[in-house]
């Protein structure tokens, strides 16, 4: 009884729990079973009574009552009649909420095709029937008949007949000899009569027999769809609809506006259209109207249903009264405003407020200031409850009155309510998880939220009018999570790189830096101080200043915690900072006995965090913030115009450079250099001049000056202090103020040759000002584009990585990646220690000299290990990586390594995919959109020579050198490398040297660090001869294949190979140079081929015919100009290009095997290159290369697998196919890191690896074996492994496949979860595909769970699920035990066992 009463008052049925969602095509019976009645009239509501019309689109009899528990005519009212159906109006007395759940239907007079299955490419109906979409449409829209049953006539099945042809056929064969139908009925018949099993069997036979690729592809597509239908239990004829479902009326509401008009959902218009046409068609059929009229009506019905499902997909868009296209059912789901992204993935919340933020320096790190007014509003329900509990009010109404009057007791209660109740602060745009953090509110007067200065970096907030939103976590669980996980004190480290993010900035840095300055000849120099008390005393009496050099005693503790002290040479300012350090044996005074620049402060905080833990760090940060502010204020640092110092040498440097540019101009006029070279040189010269002036200026600013009167050191230049400490401003900005503004870019990204010589202190001339506006405007335009692009990149990354969750502790993988330091132009940009910190070692790491184990296999590499590794100079380390992790549905903790935001091993349930996506996407807005190029000079300056980065002995790998006529060693090999070995013979560095480089060292020479090893001309690529002899030209015909180009301004000629294929006469020329001996015989090369050198277009000839050349002499050169002026994709577009795995425009051609290059017969205008393998068991590989491309290999060159045949950016797919997963991973990681490194952004490699792992989830089946897949199918890697294991156990033939690389968009759309894919992009296509295949979504990822409204399977949500599973298992055990109740002890033992597991 009791239960029933409860049910009366809580009519909500408990939510159903479910584990998966399936989508399939609805059969007519299914649609009928959903429906509560047929809709026969197009009417909506009666405009006078506002009551819904009977049998109309809002009919109360079908859909339910309008008011709770009240029938339409008003005969039955109130709860007591629940469930009764009124005999007068036929409405069931129940909740009006059922109008959101009950569906209706429309019985169609003629079948219509469902547009999704017809038009969503590839057309499912078309593929099944093996007809083209055009033909099917002709049948559906009543243009042609289709033969469904040819009988004994000469007609073929599926043959289309026009009206006349049909009439002729009827005359010829008689009407009952064959069947030809028209319209959707015809397609319905064809689909209904399909025997899918038979078709599938036939297709398999055909597949085995056919050889042509195109046919195979077509058959495979068809077979796939047939199998989908067979597996899912869908019937093909269900794609033709006889009944249209009508969605519940409250989901397509009709809202009365004032003035008697109505606002309605577009769906009602679309449904009305369908009902009108359907009713008209029924009437026409009853009246036996002429066929042509009925046919026309049927066509219109088909169009109406098409528009309802997907308006605008076919034919004209149906528009409403205001000429705006009507929103169909598909549009309701699609895009940013669709159901998925607008309502399911992001919902609006109540209990939130927003206001402007101001700084709150007196707050503690875990606090924020909340205006009283705001708090009162946000915590209302809590206040009402507390007022009631304390007896101040007996009803909610009274409580409301008290709060409105703002009585004093309300404020007291507000204080109680707010205590220990965290609130969430959020600043838009929330680019990473630190954009929402929890704080404890403290009540303040005023209307602005106070924010702690140290969390500004995380929120990217400043106080120039930014606003923030406040959210109140209501439930106990929410408060708990906010406090334990989201509290600002728990977010000290940056999830992207593990560096502290709670770092003082600006004023605080300036104050701390000022404290740490050392000055000479200050009063009291050399005094000794025993403790801080004495020092304070001396400071207050001005015996010493903050910057005096003194000796001071610093007290700390040893390992046992006993106090120890030591005397340091330091300054009073540094002693004050040192006082704040936590007392710990690992935190010495040295870390603050140095210049406190922002970097050093960050290192200090990091050090304290690693050794003293979180609590100490938070207290320490708060203290140094206070100290920084106090001393920035006391120091009184400010700057005036005179602080910008213009170097005295500026005029001279400018004059010298102007002289240089005039000289280049002259050289150009004399024809010694080309226009492009002149441009490069001029831009280069000005670039150098700017740098020189900057150096001079900085030297002036840095210089220490003494006051001649007092002899004391003058105060440091304040601008220099600000910039050097990292508080504000950069060298670049100072250069513009006090040096020279330098070169400017045009909007196109080119550099303007004439620089801006003035600086802002001197003022710009009108011309200079005009030139500088270019760059400024481009910057603004770029910023707007950048934000949108960066946001879209983040969205794609999150989508692809959302289901990468830590799901187990150790997957036991035996494979991993090899980490090496990244060297760029001889500089180490990322040391090996930085790269392996916080990763798990795959093999034991051994000391190279002693052989002792530094890190055991399977242990995480910590800071202390990194020190040893760096000292031992280990060059490569094998580590575990998420890329090679073998966990199914997720990643394991061992492969991932350290959780960067906490500095501890990663927890189970951490959503590492989303964190990776945020870490890569968040700095996106800092990347450039297009890179400015200093005319290619910036790259050139540093890439024309090679210096030794270590001391050691030289070894040449693949040595192939000759001495040319100047007596220099010249590199002749294409894959030669210079190795530098240390005294133990270990490789310290490997440098590739390009063909044609001049070598300054030879085998076994010793080199010093910084010694030049080799140099080359960065602007051209040489073609050199290996033999001595006389030059002769072949096919170098003037005007056809060679042109004498005279530089128009100089008159000097040079001979250039031109595109000889452009004229018909030159099509079969092969321009080349040969080297002959005195007798005129062609010489042989060392490899056995002729000394013939093929020339490509744009080669410049360096010798005349008949000239005598020695080995190593350049006979022609290919200018690299083209590669240089071309804008290399940089910044954001480059990152997107890599993640989308696009093939670059002119991508490199990579050799697939080791072997020798041979030239084959040319094919049209392509060159055929054959690589003959060294190993005879492999087939030779052929490549076709466009003839005009600069091509540097010669006949007979030896080439290694993975080497470039044609230069360019390699396509990632090629790297994967040729060199394997590890090479691909290192390529992608390095390339992406390069872009971020240029911007000074630190991102840990593991984030990029997680994303790349998601891109490599699929394999393409090559051998299907007994797997049941078709070659060419894309299958999950781990799924295939599992199937193969099962097949091997059963003794069947396993399948095999090659890994495929998918771009992030493609990979997101191919996730096993259709819900996730549909909410990402191409909603219609994804849902159509899923419905045909009857896909099941097992709700593994985060997105699917958010959409269906469950806890996400990560973090606490994942834990809850696990606990629930354990509980269910235990319950079942107990139930079993009760059943047996014979006192069996096994179940008890199991129970105890399970409890223990759960506890663990």
From Swiss-Prot:
Top class in the EC scheme: transferase
UniProt: Zn(2+) 2 binding residues: 811, 885, 892, 895
Cofactor(s) for this UniProt protein: Mg(2+); Zn(2+)
Chain residues that bind Mg(2+): 462, 464, 466
Catalytic activity field: RNA(n) + a ribonucleoside 5'-triphosphate = RNA(n+1) + diphosphate
EC id: 2.7.7.6
Keyword Oxidoreductase on entry: no
Name used for this protein in its record: DNA-directed RNA polymerase subunit beta'
Organism of derivation: Brucella anthropi (strain ATCC 49188 / DSM 6882 / CCUG 24695 / JCM 21032 / LMG 3331 / NBRC 15819 / NCTC 12168 / Alc 37)
Gene symbol of the encoding locus: rpoC
